[in-house]
A protein has these predicted regions:
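Noncatalytic, solvent-exposed loop/strand surfaces
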Residues: 1-265
Length: 265
């Protein structure tokens, strides 16, 4: 951990990590904790460190011991704090304060990269390797809910790396190959499936009721969610990009392979 002047405040070794890509998920802040996803090809774990000191506060083993790279999300659902994580041959929810598991869904594949999204009704997961799946999950269960809490599932158009988005009644996703889909978020009915062009590594983002998809070629496709496929705009950075865009104070930031771009008025 570093302060804003770049001075290191603490460092912590929470255990071994065997993976081709190292720690690729983002740490997550929760109250006075820093939570780290330690899914790897060994004694996998999720761990929480004291934000001020770096001391270990809790560490929960992950029994499947399989590499994954998803960043957990934390939401309050039905009055219960949940930290939900795709990875290590499962989708599971934990109490972020203690690391105790609320519920788990087995599979549906081995490795995950994309983070989940939540729309107040369902959690949406997409992955992974070696098989691709999209799941909509009712997040109010306890124990193993594999057979009871999957609202709908789809395999065509699932992504491995890019995270999806939800806008109103619509769930939008782009596959790694650049094929975008729009679903009815509640029912799982696909409204359309269209090729955007080029591979996609960046996660989708939303702003002003629109969805933004940045391709590996650096082309941003802006789509209005709906039952019909509608491209609002298409912008070419003339530079490749593999990073997810970010929005701050009305401006869009995209990191290309050579430049950082700021787009706005």
């Amino acid at each position: 951990a570093f302060d804003l002047q770049g001075k290191r405040k603490w460092s912590s070794n929470i255990g071994p990590f065997i993976s081709a890509h190292g720690f690729s998920s983002n740490p997550v802040l929760y109250r006075d904790l820093v939570i780290v996803n330690g899914d790897h090809d060994g004694d996998a774990y999720i761990a929480a460190l004291d934000r001020a000191t770096g001391k270990l506060r809790w560490k929960t083993p992950r029994e499947n011991k399989t590499r994954s790279y998803g960043t957990p999300i934390i939401r309050t659902i039905d009055g219960r704090e949940q930290m939900i994580l795709c990875g290590s041959k499962s989708i599971a929810s934990y109490d972020p304060a203690t690391g105790k598991r609320h519920w788990i869904i087995d599979g549906p594949t081995e490795q995950f990269v994309a983070s989940m999204v939540y729309n107040g009704q369902y959690l949406f997961a997409t992955g992974g390797f070696p098989e691709r799946h999209i799941l909509a999950i009712r997040p109010n269960g306890r124990g193993n809910v594999t057979e009871t809490h999957i609202a709908w599932r789809e395999r065509r158009g699932a992504s491995y790396v890019p995270s999806p988005v939800v806008l109103g009644d619509y769930f939008l996703i782009v596959s790694d190959a650049g094929i975008a889909s729009c679903f009815d978020a509640a029912k799982g009915t696909r409204h359309w499936m269209e090729r955007l062009g080029g591979g996609h590594s960046a996660s989708a983002i939303t702003a002003n009721g629109l969805a933004y998809f940045v391709s590996d070629r650096g082309i941003t496709t802006i789509i209005r969610p709906g039952k019909e496929f509608e491209v609002v705009a298409k912008n070419d950075l003339k530079e490749s990009s593999s990073s997810s865009p970010a929005i701050s104070q009305g401006q869009l930031f995209i990191r290309g392979h050579k430049h950082l771009f700021c787009i706005g008025k």
